[in-house]
Amino acid sequence: AWDPGNPALTGEPPAGQTYTRGTPNVWSAMSYDAKLNLIYLPTGNATPDFFGGERTALDDKYSSSIVAVDATTGQVRWHYQTTHHDLWDFDLPSQPLLYDLPDGKGVTTPVLVQTSKQGMIFMLNRATGEPVAKVEERPVPAGNVKGERYSPTQPYSVGMPMIGNETLTESDMWGATPVDLLLCRIQFKEMRHQGVFTPPGEDRSLQYPGSLVVMNWGS
């Protein structure tokens, strides 16, 4: 067992005790590498989904991450976070794909490919957790919700294809008739949209992609 709040506990908790409550969970499927003896856990974001002002350091450490756990000891070998201080419900929705990546010279690298709700695909060395495909930390906008804190940057997996996470513009709005199109454009202009990591607020904002689109639960 792995309890992120009590790493020393690798089995059932003693009588009358429980595992740490409220930690980021794993709601999708997991993957296992028999050669490395590692279980790969795609974690969810800490609750509540869209406000993180009361989250603990533990919540922020392991939320929306790939966590590699030794199957024998229950200890964490490495972890890699795909969304910092997740305020968008961008938890990891599918099991990591394990693949041996050839270099064209007879050598392969054990990699892990992880999809995400925000339309980014991350490729990591599954032995070390280091990115194999380039990832950039890019500045993202901050919000002004009282009691909230914001990560100044987010990881962008620029070395892999990005799907469906473009910053929307008025010209992207659609309607079956000119009237529909006009109404859609008016609503868009009335909302705040700052790209994929638009921070939630008390005003009208547009989150795109949303937490139920691009790549979600399943293989």
Model-derived segments and spans:
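Beta-sheet-rich non-transmembrane sensory/scaffold domains
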Residues: 1-219
